[in-house]
């Protein structure tokens, strides 16, 4: 089972992925958690580095080979491109664009990178890409803005157990359109 935890940078993917990993591992599951950004950077699994946006253009062929070499069938893929890696389930984490803006600014992201990611959240980019690339029955979307990570993980576990997809209920455009003007 491969679980993709995707969403705009700053939404809480790593926090949720690590907590989900710990919960599944402590329950006896032989599972690994892969932080896509770290793996791509450390192992040169990219086509080029985008200097302006301080990010990598992922080489998906190399990344897929790396994932296959991990040695376990059960994986959590933590990253905003994880929905491109043919997962069994896709968890799309969402958060209030102002919360994302504040988190990214506290990480010293450039103003251009903050703006691009806030726009991506406003326009549902990770959700839309997930729907376009995958079977919609695999997708579960969660608003993480005001939820404790433990509650988010419990919702994910319930989705994995019941397999009832839920997405398309979160929209920030009406309240936060001014952020992209």
Swiss-Prot record:
The keyword ATP-binding applies. Pfam families: AAA_18. Residues 106-116 are annotated as: LID. InterPro entries: Adenyl_kinase_AK6, P-loop_NTPase. Its EC number is 2.7.4.3. It catalyses: AMP + ATP = 2 ADP; ATP + H2O = ADP + phosphate + H(+). HAMAP family: Adenylate_kinase_AK6. Residues 35-58 are annotated as: NMP. GO terms for molecular function: adenylate kinase activity; ATP binding; ATP hydrolysis activity. Gene3D superfamilies: P-loop containing nucleotide triphosphate hydrolases (3.40.50.300). It comes from Methanococcus maripaludis (strain C7 / ATCC BAA-1331). Interacts with uS11. Not a structural component of 40S pre-ribosomes, but transiently interacts with them by binding to uS11. Transmembrane segments: none annotated. Belongs to the adenylate kinase family. AK6 subfamily. Keywords: ATP-binding, Kinase, Nucleotide-binding, Ribosome biogenesis, rRNA processing, Transferase. Disulfide bonds: none annotated. ATP binds at residues 10, 12-15, 107, 147. This is Putative adenylate kinase. Broad-specificity nucleoside monophosphate (NMP) kinase that catalyzes the reversible transfer of the terminal phosphate group between nucleoside triphosphates and monophosphates. Also has ATPase activity. Involved in the late maturation steps of the 30S ribosomal particles, specifically 16S rRNA maturation. While NMP activity is not required for ribosome maturation, ATPase activity is. Associates transiently with small ribosomal subunit protein uS11. ATP hydrolysis breaks the interaction with uS11. GO terms for biological process: ribosomal small subunit biogenesis; rRNA processing.
């Amino acid at each position: 089972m491969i679980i993709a935890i995707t969403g705009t940078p700053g939404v809480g993917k790593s926090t949720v992925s690590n907590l989900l990993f710990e919960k599944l591992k402590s329950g006896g599951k032989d599972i690994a958690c892969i932080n896509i950004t770290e793996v791509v950077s450390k192992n040169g699994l990219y086509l080029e580095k985008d200097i302006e946006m301080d990010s990598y253009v992922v080489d998906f062929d190399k990344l897929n080979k790396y994932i296959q070499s991990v040695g376990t069938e059960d994986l959590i893929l933590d990253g905003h491109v994880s929905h491109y890696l043919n997962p069994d389930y896709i968890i799309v984490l969402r958060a209030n664009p102002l919360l994302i803006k504040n988190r990214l600014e506290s990480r010293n992201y450039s103003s251009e990178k903050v703006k691009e990611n806030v726009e991506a959240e406003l326009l549902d980019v990770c959700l839309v890409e997930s729907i376009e690339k995958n079977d919609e029955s695999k997708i579960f979307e969660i608003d993480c803005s005001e939820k404790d990570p433990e509650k988010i993980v419990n919702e994910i576990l319930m989705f994995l157990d019941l397999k009832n997809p839920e997405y398309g209920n979160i929209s920030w455009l009406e309240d936060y359109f001014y952020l992209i003007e």
